Design a protein with these regions (language model features):
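Active-site loop/helix belt of alpha/beta enzymes
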Residues: 142-145, 151, 157-268
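C-terminal accessory subdomain/extension
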Residues: 287-391
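Conserved, mostly hydrophobic/aromatic
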Residues: 31, 54, 84, 154, ...
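Active-site-proximal beta-alpha core segment in soluble small-molecule metabolic enzymes
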Residues: 52-199
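Active-site loop ensemble at the mouth of alpha/beta enzyme cores that anchors a bound cofactor
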Residues: 236-315
Length: 391
């Protein structure tokens, strides 16, 4: 296998001298490869792909996912849905729409979808994930205000213990209630298997399957159809065939990947399409240098496998560790025994963030590198369209 420095240099080119740092640079070739591979996997296993846009937050990237065959898009918040409606009219809000402000914006989104449907002659589809009767009641009222049905996906807790109905009986009861309400359209079940890692045992996958199957069997015995059974997470995405009850997956990170995904074994360094370029602004000691990328650029998320390994991978210097972050400073250290090359003040280095989703949300824009674009050194600056959409 190529070293980190060799792998990095395969198709990335030097940046112009005046390129601003710190900044996020995304390689279009790597993005295309990542998107194509996931879509091919889904096609081969007859799974609908509904990618989560929380990673890239980009209308341009979302449109490419749809063009390659994605069924629709997943978002977390209504604000993201407002932006991503420019890329697809089939949207799933995988987050309970609780709160007056959020429900008002959902109502506005539904009205806009209705107006667009009237002008285009085709209906848009909006669904929301819930795990409580209280959430369902509020969304039902919102739907009645608009006079349009809202799709509902009931969230099951399959073991990650974040959101989701834990009890199968309660899940069946909630689904049955939703299926009888005017203003609501029961679309199916959703879950997030965040506790299942790539090396999970057959038993873990069986438990994941059984947690869903019990609810599905009971609903069908009551005459309630379950059209969609949706799972998620990039680490489990290409193992989803091990849970044959699924017919849809919602991975997000796969478009860019990050250092967490590399450590989990679901991506290689060459699959990491988004990297931060930073400038060395100080070399206070032989084994330490300071970057202009701090927590406001890289985020303070630690590594999911090795929390003490630092705040991202310095690709140019694999032995170095981003040991500490201030808002505008990234402190990088070498081991005491390190005898290799070191950067100088003014040099630029590349960092693969631990958690790319948070890193993207910290940027106003990113630079897309397209090898076949001769203008501006192949770089195009694009807005992070859904940045900061927290409502």
């Amino acid at each position: 296998m190529a070293s980190s420095r060799e792998a990095f240099s395969m198709h990335w080119i030097p940046l112009p001298e005046d390129h601003p740092t710190p900044s996020l640079v995304v390689d279009a070739l790597t993005v295309e490869r990542n998107l194509t591979r996931m879509q091919q996997y889904c096609n081969e296993h007859r799974l609908n792909l509904r990618p989560h846009t929380k990673t890239h937050k980009s209308i341009r990237m979302a449109k490419r996912q749809i063009a390659l065959g994605a069924k629709g898009l997943t978002v977390a918040k209504v604000g993201e849905a407002e932006r991503m409606s420019q890329a697809s009219r089939d949207l799933f809000l995988a987050y309970p729409a609780i709160g007056t402000g959020r429900l008002q914006r959902l109502e506005g989104l539904l009205r806009a979808s209705a107006e667009e449907s009237q002008s285009l002659g085709t209906a848009g589809r909006i669904a929301v994930g819930i795990d409580s009767l209280e959430a369902a009641e509020r969304i039902a009222q919102t739907a009645r205000n608009v006079g349009l049905p809202v799709g509902i996906m009931v969230d099951l807790d399959v073991g990650f213990h974040r959101t989701g109905v834990e009890s199968s009986a309660q899940a069946v009861e909630l689904c049955a209630w939703v299926s009888k309400q005017s203003g609501l359209e029961f679309r199916g079940l959703m879950c997030f298997p965040g506790h299942i890692l790539p090396a999970a045992s057959t038993e873990a996958w069986s438990q994941y399957h059984d947690a869903i199957a019990g609810v599905v069997d009971r609903l069908r015995s009551l005459g309630i159809d379950v059209p969609v059974i949706s799972g998620g997470s990039t680490p489990t995405a290409k193992e989803s065939h091990r849970n044959p009850i699924l017919n849809e997956i919602r991975p997000g990170t796969y478009i860019y990947h990050d250092w967490n995904e590399v450590a989990l074994g679901v991506a290689g360094i060459d699959d990491c399409a988004a990297r931060v370029v930073a400038t060395v602004v100080s070399v206070p000691t032989k084994n330490k240098f300071i970057l202009d990328a701090g927590s406001k650029t890289l985020s303070s998320d630690r590594h999911c496998v090795e929390p003490e390994s630092g705040f991202g991978k310095v690709v140019d210097y694999p032995d170095a560790k981003v040991s500490r972050l201030s808002e505008e400073h990234g402190e990088v250290i070498f081991p005491e025994t390190y005898a290799g090359p070191r950067p100088k003040v003014g040099d630029r280095v590349w960092i693969i963030p631990n958690h790319i989703c948070v890193c993207v949300n910290l940027q106003n824009s990113f630079f897309l590198y397209q090898q076949d674009n001769p203008e501006h050194g192949g770089l195009e600056e694009l807005a992070v369209d859904a940045r900061g959409m927290l409502v």
